[in-house]
Amino acid sequence: MVNALTEFSKKLDEKLVSPLRQVLKGRKLVSVTSPQGFGITNVDWGKITEMSGGMVSYSFTSGNTDQIDATLVNSKIPVYWKDYEIDRRIFEGWRQRGIDIDAANAIAAAYAAAKVEDAAIINGVTNDGTNYDILGLYQGAGNDYNTATTLGTFGNATTALAGAINLMDDAGIPVDSLKLNWCVNSSAYHKIRRTRSAQGQLELPDLLDLLNGGELISVGTTLTTAQAFVLPDSSVGEPYVDYYLTADFQTDPKTPEYQTTGNIGGRVFSAGVLRIKQDDAICRMSNLS
């Protein structure tokens, strides 16, 4: 029975991978490590808080010695999970006759767990709904463009995006050589995409030009319509931020070995934590409408 449940769980895992790749938004925004092992419960990393200025002299002996100011950060690694049940007869049919697995319940549970993981990466981890134990990309941004901006009026989005990138530039981030992404609420995303001038010119091409080949990305309703952020694309952003993955999404059967009736219980889970190494590489926008 235990071996059958284990094999059943593996088959479910195979069915979960492809659908989850389509719905996981947070992992598409940052570089993701290979799974490091579920037994890892916390991780240390260096967070750059200040970089010393360069020196100009006629020899290396005439300048002062400075150090990069970095703070060692330790974070617990949260687990994202959701329980599910599969009809007992479906399991028995698979075990005895090799019929196809109905993975609908497990996939639904995986979507629920993925939504929680997305919220952790995009916004942060909070237990009380107010205070963030672990900062996500929005909450952990080192810059804040808070000028009131009404989207949908031609030119406003361009002005706001340029202002946010300007703040990152002033903080020492080489924005002119980085591919950037602008991540917005789903409502703002569609409003921006349809914005045109009185002459019918779309605003989107101007925005994409500012992003150096990056994208306008919808993160759904994880952020409110007033919230957005700009950050380096995952292809170039690993020095600034990454997602430390300890366990990729997988299933774990919970039905006891001796149980022969009742539905098959299981759990879908993953584990990982966002590591913001240089928060100035992210600029949030907090006053959009």
Regions found by a protein language model. Give the residues of each.
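Helix N-cap / beta->alpha transition motif
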Residues: D87-F91, V184-A188, Q278
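Residue-level signal for secondary-structure boundary elements
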Residues: A114-E117, I121, D169, I173-D176, ...
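Long, hydrophobic/aromatic-enriched structural stretches that serve as scaffold segments
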Residues: V32-I99
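Extended, solvent-exposed, turn-rich assembly/linker loops in the middle of proteins
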Residues: Y132-P205
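Short, charged/polar micro-motifs that form catalytic or ligand-binding hotspots
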Residues: A70, R95-A103, G172-V175, K179
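Alpha-helical scaffold segments that mediate packing/assembly in large oligomeric complexes
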Residues: W81, E85-A164
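A general secondary-structure signal for short beta-strands and their flanking turns/coil
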Residues: I77-V79, S177, T261
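Sequence/fold signature of self-assembling virion shell proteins
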Residues: M1-G54, K191-S289
